[in-house]
Amino acid sequence: MQNISLRKATTDDAAFALHVTEACMRVYAERTWGTWNGLPDFDPATDMIVERDGCGIGMIGVDRRQEFWILERIYLLPAHQKQGIGSFLLQCLIEEAVSEQAVLRLTVLEVNPARRFYERHGFILTHTISPRHHMEWRKS
């Protein structure tokens, strides 16, 4: 996708990570637990910063374990959602998983409509342990 790039996250990205996490997840956290903890959903070891024209617009985190990969997060600031960027990032991850013969797993809060986004990309619901849906993508 034009003008979209990824760079490895660093500890210097913590404030940006908090901003993105809050913009993307606060409403769902409040609907689920009644409160927002104000902590960034961020791990520099697994996260990449999504940039458009060199400016941070989101982040994606993937824990690449030996037996499977976990998509920890794919967050885009609201102004950059619904433009195909998330689909582009997820499709790139799926292609990488195929080449590495990896299964992708994720969880999504029950109140988060992102479940439909993942289903459109071939993820299937494996089980639900409230308040999260557990989903998986594997090459068929």
Spell out what each predicted region is.
Residues 84:
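Glycine-rich phosphate-binding loop
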Residues 1-5, 140:
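Short, low-complexity, intrinsically disordered N-terminal peptides in bacterial proteins
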Residues 87, 111-131:
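Conserved active-site alpha-helix within GNAT-family acetyltransferase domains
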Residues 97-109:
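Conserved GNAT acetyl-CoA-binding A-motif
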Residues 4, 8-79, 89-96, 127-130:
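Acetyl-CoA-dependent GNAT
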Residues 131, 136-140:
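Terminal substrate-recognition subdomain of acyl/acetyltransferases
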